[in-house]
Amino acid sequence: MARIAGVNIPNHQHTVIGLTAIFGIGTTRAHQICKTTGVAIDKKVKDLIDADLEKLRDEVGKFVTEGDLRREVTMSIKRLMDLGCYRGVRHRKDLPVRGQRTKTNARTRKGPRKSGVQLKK
């Protein structure tokens, strides 16, 4: 298995698909990386030579990926919550942030249904 940006890339996959295993690299960026490094898109990871892997490592290193990107996203959400803006409030309440309806849907974000309010006896 090839190791790029701290992630083990599966040997049986094509280079482009294998690069998408890295958090922060999707298919578009993976194609871009392969094009700039000159690595064949349809080549399997196990068939790459060390020089190709080194080129890929250098190119991937130019982007914010994995832990740094996760930290950046978390800090961005925390900043919204500290500001108290609408998006921050929605994050704090664990509700959909981008204007989706919540009266009937949004079960994934809200979690399982809570039982009705019980009256005191």
Swiss-Prot record:
<dbReference type="GO" id="GO:0019843">
    <property type="term" value="F:rRNA binding"/>
</dbReference>
<dbReference type="InterPro" id="IPR010979">
    <property type="entry name" value="Ribosomal_uS13-like_H2TH"/>
</dbReference>
<dbReference type="GO" id="GO:0006412">
    <property type="term" value="P:translation"/>
</dbReference>
<comment type="similarity">
    <text>Belongs to the universal ribosomal protein uS13 family.</text>
</comment>
<feature type="compositionally biased region" description="Basic residues">
    <location>
        <begin position="100"/>
        <end position="121"/>
    </location>
</feature>
<protein>
    <recommendedName>
        <fullName>Small ribosomal subunit protein uS13</fullName>
    </recommendedName>
</protein>
<comment type="function">
    <text>Located at the top of the head of the 30S subunit, it contacts several helices of the 16S rRNA. In the 70S ribosome it contacts the 23S rRNA (bridge B1a) and protein L5 of the 50S subunit (bridge B1b), connecting the 2 subunits; these bridges are implicated in subunit movement. Contacts the tRNAs in the A and P-sites.</text>
</comment>
<keyword id="KW-0699">rRNA-binding</keyword>
<dbReference type="InterPro" id="IPR019980">
    <property type="entry name" value="Ribosomal_uS13_bac-type"/>
</dbReference>
<dbReference type="InterPro" id="IPR018269">
    <property type="entry name" value="Ribosomal_uS13_CS"/>
</dbReference>
<dbReference type="InterPro" id="IPR027437">
    <property type="entry name" value="Rbsml_uS13_C"/>
</dbReference>
<comment type="subunit">
    <text>Part of the 30S ribosomal subunit. Forms a loose heterodimer with protein S19. Forms two bridges to the 50S subunit in the 70S ribosome.</text>
</comment>
<dbReference type="GO" id="GO:0015935">
    <property type="term" value="C:small ribosomal subunit"/>
</dbReference>
<dbReference type="InterPro" id="IPR001892">
    <property type="entry name" value="Ribosomal_uS13"/>
</dbReference>
<keyword id="KW-0689">Ribosomal protein</keyword>
<keyword id="KW-0820">tRNA-binding</keyword>
<keyword id="KW-0687">Ribonucleoprotein</keyword>
<dbReference type="GO" id="GO:0003735">
    <property type="term" value="F:structural constituent of ribosome"/>
</dbReference>
<dbReference type="GO" id="GO:0000049">
    <property type="term" value="F:tRNA binding"/>
</dbReference>
<dbReference type="GO" id="GO:0005829">
    <property type="term" value="C:cytosol"/>
</dbReference>
<feature type="region of interest" description="Disordered">
    <location>
        <begin position="94"/>
        <end position="121"/>
    </location>
</feature>
<dbReference type="Pfam" id="PF00416">
    <property type="entry name" value="Ribosomal_S13"/>
</dbReference>
<keyword id="KW-0694">RNA-binding</keyword>
